[in-house]
Amino acid sequence: YNVKKVFDVTQTNGRKAPAVSANRDPKALITTMLDVSPVEVAATDELPYPNMAAFYNNEKQTLYVKRNVGDSVAVAQCVAQELGHAQLSINSESYSRRDMGFQAVCIGYMICKKYGVDTQNFAINRIPEGLASKEPKEIRAELSKTRNAMAEIHSHISDEMFRKKQERSKDYER
């Protein structure tokens, strides 16, 4: 006999994850991410870091997006990462951009990976010294914060995409 633990589909309550496809439109993803942002969103011509397409300012609780950036993939990557910063600041009592930078990069990577946006620009292979020197329990706690922030952002994005898809299907019926 080969005994295994199995579940009946009726015993589960999870949603089916959207299939990753490389042909998703980064512009549509950007629009959706900005629509579901947990903080205020504002367009600007200049950011504190000129090579960034988006920047989260914790003092003002605002996500700034640079105007006229031609590369929609780069904008999607920056917005995803900065949404990570915004969600992490909401979920924690003491927020430090420098301390939570790696977690935000990981969240941006996971969002882009899940929605089919190129992820080569994310430096997730360099683990910060502060995280590498922690005890396993502390590392699990940090990873748990990252996972929770990612899950929250993803649920908002997928709910909004589903809502938009429903609206489009209703329009086609007319």
PLM features: residue spans?
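N-terminal accessory/interface modules of nucleic-acid-binding and processing proteins
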Residues: 1-174
